[in-house]
Amino acid sequence: AAKSKDIAANYITQGCVGIFGANEGSTVGTGNAIQEAGQTVIGVGFDKSDTILNLIKNGYILCTMAQNPDVMGYEGIQSAVKALEGEDVGEEFIDTGVSVINKDTL
């Protein structure tokens, strides 16, 4: 998160108006850089942690896309059972979706 914060701070200094963090570390780094800059920069992230949820609650990150681990686990087990029983497991990739979390959905 520290390196991501430095990178995000550099972008903010150059006038960037929006930053996307592609994982927890870069999302936290982006939120912390926005907080320290005291400027209006839109931060959007990917992943879910208590730190990210607090950054959203405090207005430093607009939203984050969170994976659905329960769906991932369910679909994984379903595919494993089918494979063990010799059945066709279907698609090579299974879209388990994401949930968008913002202040309104906290």
Sequence positions of predicted segments:
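A residue-level marker of the well-folded mature domains of exported/periplasmic proteins
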Residues: A1-L106
